[in-house]
């Protein structure tokens, strides 16, 4: 069974309080921008910048609740995350508040796998953007809720495994670097070893150019 996102989610966006009004900024209200999402984004519960309740009121911002699937709609298109708590956003999003018919994690993994497709839907001359209508008309396979949750769990476990392997590789890289420094020192400590030129310990050979008309 296929379903339109507009039939199973409420699509919402946001806006930016005036930057010239200091009373709107540096409060305790979470307010995100697309730049805060990256390839490792999953559940986010805080923002880089914060606004005040006055900024919320004067700008007419509407909050989206925990569990909302966050989707960047421009600059760039297709970054995704899940809101870990109630927050607000700027105009660079088309976020999806899920109904009881769809699991937010299932929707997150679906959209994460469709970044190229989402980018192909972008419209605009100066920079591409996907509109609310475009997002609402995207279709998604919609199995029973139990199957959605089972799929989400499998992808979550895979994500954990990938992150574990990534951490292990980073630790191994640091181990190799520290071992190298331990053996050879830093770039400023080479005088702890005898030094010589490459020519002293190896024969340097070069190739020649063969004229193709003569030898082929």
Q: Model regions: which residues?
A:
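Residues that recognize and position ribonucleotide moieties
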Residues: 1, 30, 69, 87, ...
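Amphipathic alpha-helical coiled-coil segments
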Residues: 158-169
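Short helix/loop capping segments that flank catalytic or ligand/cofactor-binding pockets
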Residues: 40-42, 80, 149
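Non-catalytic DNA-recognition/assembly elements of restriction-modification systems
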Residues: 1-15, 137-152, 167-209
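A short beta-sheet element
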Residues: 33-34, 48-112
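Sequence-specific dsDNA recognition surfaces
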Residues: 6-21, 35-66, 199-215
């Amino acid at each position: 069974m296929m379903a339109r996102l507009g039939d199973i989610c409420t699509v919402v966006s946001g806006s930016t309080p005036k930057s010239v009004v200091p009373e709107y900024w540096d409060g305790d209200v979470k307010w995100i921008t697309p730049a805060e999402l990256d390839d490792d984004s999953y559940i986010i519960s805080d923002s880089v910048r914060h606004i005040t309740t006055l900024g919320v009121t004067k700008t007419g911002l509407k909050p989206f609740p925990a569990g909302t699937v966050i989707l960047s709609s421009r600059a760039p298109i297709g970054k995704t995350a899940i809101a870990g708590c109630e927050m607000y956003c700027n105009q660079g999003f088309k976020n999806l508040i899920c109904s009881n018919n769809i699991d937010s994690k299932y929707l997150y993994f679906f959209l994460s796998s469709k970044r190229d497709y989402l980018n192909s839907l972008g419209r605009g001359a100066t920079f591409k953007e996907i509109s609310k209508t475009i997002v609402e008309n995207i279709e998604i396979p919609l199995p029973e809720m139990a199957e959605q949750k089972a799929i989400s769990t499998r992808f979550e476990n895979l994500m954990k495994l990938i992150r574990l392997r990534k951490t292990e590789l980073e630790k191994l890289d640091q181990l190799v670097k520290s071992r190298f420094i331990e053996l050879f020192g830093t770039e400023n400590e080479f005088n702890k070893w005898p030094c010589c030129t490459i020519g002293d310990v190896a024969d340097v050979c070069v190739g020649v150019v063969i004229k193709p008309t003569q030898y082929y």
